[in-house]
């Protein structure tokens, strides 16, 4: 709407803008003409020109007698006028010639308008007034006397006053005066606001003009003529369109409205009659299938409906889709939404429809008849009209299977009784809503069937009402002849339905009316969607009595009604009542007592028991109610049954007792009650588990405590692994179930017994390992269990079959917390040895458990000094094993680093570390205070030991730490002797370079290190010899040992060719004899090859030997036997042994010189044997 208004205003503004532009153009033209005239005029002052004077004189003659030759009658006055002035303006002043006229009569015109015209004629001045009537009259007067300029000025003045409300009037005026500008302007405004014009706006317009305008403005002139309620215009349209009738009469406009419907909706009976007389279709329908009669009723138009019915409209026409007849629409009216007058008019229409032959049994798209609709709408007026119709079928059902009576029993009337409702504005529901004046009562009086069973479900109206929770309706039907034992397709009676929905009053009434409380359903009822969350007790069950239903759906008030009825039925005078049977079972084999328990109705259950219900009845699966209550975990029901003496000894088909079931279902109160009643607490289940274990295995300590409190044995010997005997404590520890183990300990079970063989000796290792619970807990690392065992007096020093105590087991299993607990125990003995002879400390060291070892040392300070069967303490063993971690640990706990092995060797840890070759351990022992000069039983220091092995680094470490490098052992050997003896080149280098050891010292055998080298030299002897000379260039090579043997002789005797060559190369004497007269020339060897090569390699003359006898023939020198020397080998010879002479070129001896036979051969043959 707002957008349309804006569009119209914009169009109107556009017209005004166009008009303004025209005026601007005209003004510009006028100014142009004025300037042109001024240029052509006399150059004299404009006030002195002839034209100016003439105009001024004419203006002054207005209403003056001067020069007057004419009288004009204006109203009651006579005005002096001048013919020449009038003639100058127009020639149309009178029918006669103006020159012969003495008086002009204008008394028929408005005097004020006339005077305004005369003033303009004389002065050319016109005063506009905001009065459209005045301007219109002035324009008409100007048109009468053909004063064209005045008319144009008035026309423009009127245009500024035109609006929606007066545009029609001005259009008429413009048309009369042929004022085309004004007429076009009004036409534009009419076109812009065509739909906003009212019938009053057209009332003064002539029929011809209005018809002409309507035809020009709309495609549907007839509809517009009816809307403005102009019958004369309709008549003109009918005359003009006579050839196209009646087709034109049945056309719908853009809004889908028919001409006849427009006339009827405005109550234009004459026009409507005219249209009908010209064959307008009274049954014409719109695109929705609604006829004129439907529309008339829809808008509550009694006039239209009556007119159409009288003119033969089809009274059974149905709309498209909804299929509603006029009777349906009439019935839809409700007194809650419409006034009593409207309702009365609808009743008149209904009466007229029925009199005209309307069918009261027609059904709409939902299958509802007008009677259905009137009941649903509460339309008592139409309802009463329909009941009077003899053709009315009361048993027709809608698509939901509902008869009119079903709808009526759901309709509660509002009482108008002042005693019930003293305040008219606040309606209240009357308690007796189904009185004789109610729809339902009137339908039954008219003959409606009270049962009307549904074809799909077989439910009668009574069952439907009860199922919908409408107890008042159900009571009404029950007391008005409904069949109380009617059964639907599932075998359910109204009493079942009432019990299922908790309708206590209806249940009582049905029982009074003779309903059978022992009828059982034949099939399970379908589960409604909204009941999906309800208890499953009522799902898929049949063979239910009404009492089953009431209990299953948890309606205790209904149950009470039936129980009271049983008590009353025995004394009732009414033979209709039947006594309920409480022993009947449903398809799940449940009695009403069981259902009462499951729904928590224990008061009802007690009453049922009081009425003779059996408490120990078994179901088909062998379960009693007590078993079922426990399995449902319904403690309240189970306790209820126990209080009422239910049998606790009955077993299920699986052999389970009530006690086992109660434990399995975690019901502590029920367990307590069963134990209180003397149940056997030792009965095992099918797996051999006693009740106490069942409780503990499921973490039910409260139940276990209850069992123990009632005297249950916490030890409980039973079968174990491999058929041995074990307690529950053994089993709990084996399964790592600490809470259970601790509970059993606190409950006083046997904490010290190991497992036992079975009665016939059954059992494998477990039966004979002798491990107590404390051993087992320590092995599995069960800290809480160990602590609990210690608190409750377990033997901390008990030994198993291997002699191990619990702390042995804990250490071997590396459980630190448990070790700490055991070490902290006041009664523990830390010196107990197992069969391997290991104490706890030894065990800790074996498993490198330093933390445990330290804890033991804190408790037992001498533990670290204990020795094994080889006399070794832990430090000795750790050093021998090169276990630096253990060594460091023992050092950290201040173990004695100088303790000796308690055997024949008496070695210290430092000796052992050197033997093991561990530099890091040697260093740490020295740092820890080990004595570096401690001697072995052979009086050897650690340096002696290191020198014998290839341990140069350790030798350096010992030297750095101040070892006595000059110390000699029992054979007088210092470290260098031993290093040379074992050929340790690197050790020798360290000794020769890093200390001042005496390299020429003789041992007890009179041998220096080089003698040792000659005697014991190995492959690297030559390298060692070179090292000696490198470190000691002036070493005495020819110094003999105690036997008089030099290094060369010793090496030659050992066949050490490399060493011999090195010694000869160093300039040693070749022919020195030992004490036995042996030298390298006469020593018996297999071949002289080595000797010849040694002689051949001589590069300079060797030193001469000295002595008292010949080195070759041993002849003593005297006066007759002179001394000679071999110039090649330097030996001392007699004359006979040195007869050969030969130049020795390599010695730069060019003259022949004396040589021995061997050297002669070497020099002549080249060293070849």
Curated annotation (Swiss-Prot):
Zn(2+) 1 binds at residues 1110, 1113, 1134, 1137. PROSITE patterns: ANK_REP_REGION, ANK_REPEAT, BTB, ZF_FYVE. Residues 68-130 form the BTB domain. A zinc finger (FYVE-type) spans 1104-1164. Zn(2+) 2 binds at residues 1126, 1129, 1156, 1159. A motif (NPF) lies at residues 421-423. One of its GO terms (cellular component) is early endosome. This is Rabankyrin-5. The lineage of its organism: Eukaryota, Metazoa, Chordata, Craniata, Vertebrata.
